[in-house]
A protein has these predicted regions:
Chain A
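A structural signal for multi-pass alpha-helical bundles of membrane permease subunits
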Residues: 2-276
Length: 276, 432, 304
């Protein structure tokens, strides 16, 4: 970029500072309010808390089933991502390395799913899950998350596998390995960066999904964190400090995940956008 | 050959993952059925504000029935109806379900999900007939224990009234005079907003407006199709509510129900048009019966009889498909009895039990509210019965018309016409 | 010599190859088709039915659609949601897309701190839309909020924009990320050549950066479009499924939820009608994608 004058840079940093403030302030407010007792929220709405009031968090953990909700979200995210990776990798391997009549169409078929909003089939998905006996169980949300994540997985992994030099597979084939063994022993280890990217990119929307848990899950034992957030917000609306503690707790895992794994995340998005 | 073993391995892993997911799902379902002797009954209602209090009340049941615990999981008021129905339809509903009166609760029975309680409720014949009707079919099947009624009126902060030397108004003109004085003094006259769709209809219109449209007799005429919402008496009610617009706080268009409660409870406004159920909320916020007073909806002219909206609020139903039917029946019998009634009214002042037993009210505000019914003509919320059975329901239409009127989107006449015309699209007695 | 990619070899080998291919493809294909694609088609089928309960059973043909488009109390909601969604989309595009583009330019500058800004800009996107909605709702409270006594969420003119601002605040980081990646991908020789020729920042942007980023602009626009026209969470958290005030914040997502899953008292229409709403959404989104394709791909087929 052009070399700026001192003034230009000052203006730039001012702009950036303003932008950072716009991002940070609501988050700051969320955390700070969660550390106040309800009365102080009204007398001192925007300033830092007078004391570090941890009761809101303590109450949330002891009075509500927060541990269960958190565990459910973890199971849903974990199992879904494993399945997305596994299923996508298997399909991507065939689509990348094999050319047969219809393979291009099949690939397009998968990738089209990137812009098909699964929400539009919700009524029938609910019907399906009830029919299979999966509603009000984590399995229903898992299956939905997997279906949503497969297009991106196939999209990313197919290209990635294509880039793996054919010589490696050919050499293995000469040695007597079958396709499946090639996949398991040679391709998969090389795929790890792409797998990590797919995993991290999918984690955020799966963790934060509200719509499908709202429609598919009913009993308390099955709720995930976003659903519990909405429930607790409704139950304790009159206690603002508590409500913000709930919001903060809901946000910590994903923010942490992002800060720790942003490298993989960016890698995943890079792959996706470069091809788009 | 070697290759096949590996292919199988990969495939097996994939299958196992799917199986693991299904197992996780099914086990979450299975968790609910407990094989042990101790039973947990799931109870649901729309009263999310009452978790602590309800737990204390239900603990009394567990004292006499040690192997039965009640797990109270309320759902936010606005989501409750859909949640309840969805739960019943998909067999994931609670065991004990609070039911709204008339059509909304009736759909649960019509769907075949509720247990017939006609022979289960002890002394059903001693319950007030108007209450029983709200949870029974015309053929005499009662599907909900008539549990709780609520009333509507105006709360006020005693200290603010004393400051201006104000007395509780009994007529509308006195009421407006009080509002004027407070406004001139710079006080927030009402902690009232126009954002939430239901508050203006359920409390302000049905509560304060009833004195203008003529209470129960007008409501009956309306349901029969003999009266219209565009008739002068109903329009007078709309107009009266509209006249309160200038006393609403700055920003009232964006003030939601919870903020309203907070505002009044923390002493930032002089009056609050609300329901008897709010007593507990205000107490929790620091405004107990020593600090706040209450008066009944002011009558239109001096000498009028009070038309008092004593609404049939909640009945208690039993899920036919409950996995702990016997324990649930025990609980139903208990909630229809005196011990529950007394404990409930102690913990949740402002809810008036229909139970035919002698109970004493400990809260002075609740006592005032209850006494007002003695000398009044009682009615229920305007378009609750029959007129909200289908879409667009009377309730949701009022929820658009009244807030719209309060932000001057509609005139009182237009608001009335809006509800009337939309109802006429499906309500047979209105089509002519 | 072992088989190669299935083109030669004995029939048994070919069969084995196909079995292998099927085994690898089917799991993903099945889950994708059965859980994502088929339900959408099935919902379209269900829209031709009516009746209470979870699964409508009376076949009524196009009666639901007739009802939706001829009866005022239904059509008002559908057209209202459509109009709101368009306004919503335009505001979000302006902030998230246009402003995001310029911010992406800013965070890719070769100055100290730019990488940090870039990393932080994505933070709001990691939150749940629900959390953002609740947060903004509290901030806009007329009594205790940040922005004074004005009823932002109560005034029909400002409520929907408030939702759009909240969503943009949250997702601008995603646009910045994608644009930044694109900017990173511009070969530095191009930029240097332009600099040598004396181009300033604005000319550089217009003639080099923007054309290079056009595919990404297209992708971001498409993502925003599909996301906005199915957006539900922000309405739920900021103005409830009743889309207060008076349905002026109603988007297709909230209309669909309310129509399909609420009781009549709260504005529900029954499952058959709800399915009709989701089918209408399918058409609207498809139409939008078709328009997008024409704008971003069709007219560019001749260019690089």
């Amino acid at each position: 970029m052009s070399t700026g004058l001192k003034l230009k840079d000052k203006f730039y940093y001012l702009l950036m500072a303003f932008y950072m403030a716009v991002i940070a302030y609501p988050l700051y407010l969320m955390v700070v309010t969660s550390l106040k007792p309800n009365a102080e929220v009204f007398t001192n709405p925007f300033g830092p808390p007078k004391t570090l009031y941890l009761d809101n968090y303590a109450n949330m953990i002891s009075r509500s089933n927060y541990g269960t909700y958190f565990g459910n979200s973890l199971v849903v995210a974990g199992v879904s991502i494993m399945m997305i990776v596994a299923l996508s990798a298997l399909a991507a391997y065939v689509l990348a390395k094999h050319r047969f009549r219809g393979s291009a169409a099949l690939y397009a078929f998968f990738v089209a799913g990137l812009i098909i909003p699964i929400k539009l089939g919700t009524i029938s998905i609910l019907k399906l899950m009830i029919g299979w006996g999966l509603h009000d169980g984590l399995g229903s949300v898992i299956l939905v998350s997997v279906a949503t994540g497969i297009p991106f997985g196939v999209f990313i992994l197919t290209d990635f596998i294509r880039m793996i030099p054919e010589e490696l597979s050919s050499a293995a084939r000469i040695d007597g390995c079958g396709e499946a063994a090639i996949f398991a022993r040679i391709i998969t280890p090389l795929l790890l960066p792409a797998i990590a990217a797919v995993a991290v990119v999918n984690f955020i929307p799966i963790w934060n999904d509200f719509w499908f848990p709202l429609v598919l899950l009913k009993s308390d034992a099955a709720k995930t964190v976003p659903l519990a957030t909405a429930l607790l917000f409704g139950q304790y609306q009159t206690n603002y400090g508590y409500v913000f503690a709930v919001l903060t707790m809901a946000s910590v895992p994903v923010v942490l995940m992002y800060l720790l794994f942003s490298k993989w995340f960016i890698k995943g998005m890079t792959e996706g956008s470069v091809k788009g | 050959m070697k290759t096949f073993k590996h292919a199988k391995a990969v495939r097996t892993i994939a299958v196992l993952l799917v199986a693991a997911a299904l197992a996780a799902g099914l086990s979450a379902c299975a968790k609910k059925t407990e094989a042990s002797k101790s039973v947990t009954l799931n109870l649901t209602s729309w009263r999310t504000e009452d978790i602590e209090r309800m737990n204390r009340v239900n603990a009394l049941f567990t004292k006499t029935h040690p192997n039965i615990t009640i797990n109270f999981q309320p759902v936010n008021d606005t989501e409750y109806d859909a949640n309840m129905r969805a739960g019943l339809e998909t067999d994931t509903g609670a065991d004990i379900i609070w039911l709204r009166s008339y059509d909304t609760g009736r759909t649960a029975y019509d769907g075949g999900w509720l247990y017939d309680l006609t022979k289960v409720i002890p002394d059903l014949d001693k319950f007030p007939p108007s209450a029983v009707k709200a949870w029974s079919t015309a053929e005499g099947v009662t599907y909900g224990v008539p549990s709780v009624g609520v009333t509507h009126g105006v709360y006020y902060q005693k200290s603010i009234f004393e400051k201006y030397g104000l007395k509780e108004p009994s007529t509308w003109d006195e009421f407006i005079a009080v509002c004027e004085t407070l406004k001139k003094g710079g006080e927030n006259v009402f902690a009232q907003g126009a954002l939430d769709d239901w508050t203006l209809y359920e409390v302000v219109f049905s509560g304060l407006g009833a004195n203008f449209y003529g209470g129960e007799s007008a409501r009956q005429a309306l349901m029969a199709g003999k009266a219209k919402l565009t008739d002068p008496n109903f329009v007078a009610a709309f107009k009266a509510i509209d006249s309160l617009q200038k006393y609403l706080p700055k920003g009232y268009e964006g003030l939601d129900y919870v903020s309203m409660q907070q505002m009044f409870g923390s002493g930032q406004a002089a009056m609050f048009m609300g329901g008897s159920w709010e007593i507990g909320v205000f107490e929790d916020l620091g405004s107990d019966s020593a600090k706040i007073g209450w008066f009944a909806p002011p009558v239109a002219k001096a000498g009028d009889k009070l038309q008092y909206c004593f609404h049939v609020d909640a009945g208690i139903g039993l899920n036919k498909k409950s996995k702990n039917l016997d324990a649930a029946i025990e609980y139903i019998k208990w909630v229809a009895g005196a011990e529950y009634a007394q404990a409930f009214m102690n913990e949740l002042p402002g809810f008036f039990m229909y139970t035919p037993a002698k109970v004493t009210l400990t809260n002075s505000l609740a006592q005032e509210m209850f006494d007002a019914a003695g000398t009044a003509d009682n009615t229920v919320r305007t378009v609750w019965e029959k007129l909200s059975a289908q879409s667009p329901s009377g309730n949701s239409l009022m929820g658009v018309a009244l807030p719209g009127m309060m932000v001057d989107k509609y005139t009182p006449e237009q608001a009335a016409a809006y509800v009337q015309d939309q109802l006429a699209s499906w309500y047979a007695p209105f089509k002519n | 010599m072992k088989r190669n990619d299935g083109k030669t070899g004995r029939r048994f080998d070919r069969l084995r190859t196909w079995v292998f291919r099927a085994a690898f493809l089917l799991p993903a294909l099945l889950v994708y088709a059965v859980v994502l694609l088929i339900p959408i088609l099935d919902s379209m089928r269900l829209s031709l039915y009516s009746g209470g309960g979870l699964v409508p059973t009376d076949f009524v043909g196009l009666a639901n659609y007739v009802k939706i488009f001829t009866e005022e109390s239904f059509s008002a909601h559908v057209w209202g949601a459509f109009r709101n969604n368009i306004v919503f989309f335009l505001i979000v595009t302006l902030i998230q897309n246009a402003l995001g583009f310029f911010l992406a330019l800013a965070v890719t500058r070769a100055v100290r701190g730019a990488a940090f800004f870039r990393k932080i800009s994505f933070l709001p996107t990691t939150l749940s839309v629900l959390v953002v909605g609740f947060l903004f709702r509290q901030m806009l409270n007329p009594i205790w909020g940040l922005l004074g006594n004005y009823p932002w969420l109560g005034n029909e003119a400002t409520a929907l924009p408030a939702l759009a601002v909240a969503v943009s605040w949250q997702f601008i980081g995603e646009s910045i990320l994608l644009y930044a990646i694109g900017i990173d991908g511009i070969p530095s020789e191009h930029l240097e050549a332009a600099r040598i020729d004396g181009a300033d920042w604005m000319q550089e942007t217009r003639h080099i950066v923007l054309p290079a980023l056009m595919p990404i602009v297209g992708m971001v626009t498409l993502l925003i479009f599909v996301g906005d026209f199915t957006q539900f969470d922000i309405v739920y958290s900021m103005t409830t499924t009743m889309a207060n005030p008076r349905y002026t914040t109603d988007l297709f997502g909230s209309l669909f939820y309310r129509a399909a899953f609420s009781t009549p008292v709260r504005g529900g229409w029954g499952m058959g009608m709800g399915a009709a709403v989701s089918t209408i959404m399918v058409f609207v989104v498809s139409l939008g994608v078709a328009v997008w394709y024409y704008l971003f791909k069709g007219s560019r087929r001749g260019e690089v």
